[in-house]
Amino acid sequence: MSKRPTIAITCGEPAGIGPEISIRAAWELRADVKSILIGDAAFLAMIAGAINPDIHLSALSWQAVRNSGLPAFPRDQITVIDCPLAAHVVPGRLDAQNGRYVLQTLDIAIDGAMQHWFDAIVTAPLQKSTINDAGVPFTGHTEYLADKTATKQVVMMLATNATLQPLRVALATTHLALKDVAAAITFDSLAGIIDILHADLQQKFGIAKPRILVTGLNPHAGEGGYLGREEIDVITPVLQAAQAKGYDVRGPYPADTLFQQKLLAGADCVLAMYHDQGLPVLKYASFGLGVNITLGLPIIRTSVDHGTALDLAAAGLGQADHGSMLEAIRVAAQMAAASKASAE
């Protein structure tokens, strides 16, 4: 990359593997990306020194950034925006006292991205229970980002480059009980999701005419109505309306036969109706190398495809694989470049 993008990385749950994988990935990609870690500077410096004494961190306060903007970024160091912990961290052991700290790091990242100081944000995994135990109702990164950016509808998409061709799988519904999925798939909701997918694949991925393949909800895509009418009553009318706008959107396909090379060739994204319909295929092919992307936001956000791995954190440094974090940063940088190009 001729000009390094500025990527803010929230280090997530401090007792998990987030701080370690964030430091490792930021250091490995320092030649191509200006990574800004957001977290407790002393805590991160301690981890960095244990990983590699040659890793140099430079700390600054968020107030200094707000007053004077971001300083220059030497390639031989990582910048940290200091956000002090509330309590001492024991690897692998959750502490609700640090729940609000995790949200503070997110708030800094969101604020900086909205102010255009950061080209994108990448989030390390957090522990929802710790934040809720701190007295803050919290359902997840995606919902929090949507609320903080006043975004009405967002789309969760996972992507990987570990397959024969890049595979992107978006979801019409996310963390819902299976019994609630059918009722959540309405004409307006599905149409809005396809609008977001089409727009962001163009603007944030640089795909001029994206092709989107859509699964049915029911086995065999409803078998002509014998196994459910959602395909007839909702999904097909939505696809016809999208096609009338000029979108290259196809389906509904039976989900059990969609993920084959002859159908995926030339496709830019698959839209699945629910979480465990679309993600097992992607995670089987690329677990540890996948990237979670939130579409529909006014900012770019990617994340890893795994959790806090408290057991690995408790076992000590060097146990965790930072491959997904590397990919999340790379994808964020690529999306930032595509977004700038589309805006020119």
Swiss-Prot record:
Binding, a divalent metal cation: H175, H220, H275
Keywords attached to this entry: Cobalt, Cytoplasm, Magnesium, Metal-binding, NAD, NADP, Oxidoreductase, Pyridoxine biosynthesis, Zinc
UniProt subcellular location: Cytoplasm
Pathway stated in the Swiss-Prot or TrEMBL entry: Cofactor biosynthesis; pyridoxine 5'-phosphate biosynthesis; pyridoxine 5'-phosphate from D-erythrose 4-phosphate: step 4/5
Gene3D superfamilies referenced in this protein's UniProt entry, alphabetically: Isopropylmalate Dehydrogenase (3.40.718.10)
Subunit structure: Homodimer.
First-tier enzyme category under EC: oxidoreductase
Binding of substrate, residues: H141, T142, K283, N292, R301
Molecular functions (GO terms): 4-hydroxythreonine-4-phosphate dehydrogenase activity; cobalt ion binding; magnesium ion binding; NAD binding; zinc ion binding
Enzymatic reactions: 4-(phosphooxy)-L-threonine + NAD(+) = 3-amino-2-oxopropyl phosphate + CO2 + NADH
GO-annotated biological processes: pyridoxal phosphate biosynthetic process; pyridoxine biosynthetic process
Protein name: 4-hydroxythreonine-4-phosphate dehydrogenase
Physiological role: Catalyzes the NAD(P)-dependent oxidation of 4-(phosphooxy)-L-threonine (HTP) into 2-amino-3-oxo-4-(phosphooxy)butyric acid which spontaneously decarboxylates to form 3-amino-2-oxopropyl phosphate (AHAP).
A single cellular component GO annotation: cytoplasm
InterPro entries tied to this protein: PdxA (IPR037510), PdxA_fam (IPR005255)
Required cofactor(s): Zn(2+); Mg(2+); Co(2+)
Additional observations: The active site is located at the dimer interface.
Known EC number: 1.1.1.262
Cleavable signal peptide: none
Cofactor binding summary note: Binds 1 divalent metal cation per subunit. Can use ions such as Zn(2+), Mg(2+) or Co(2+).
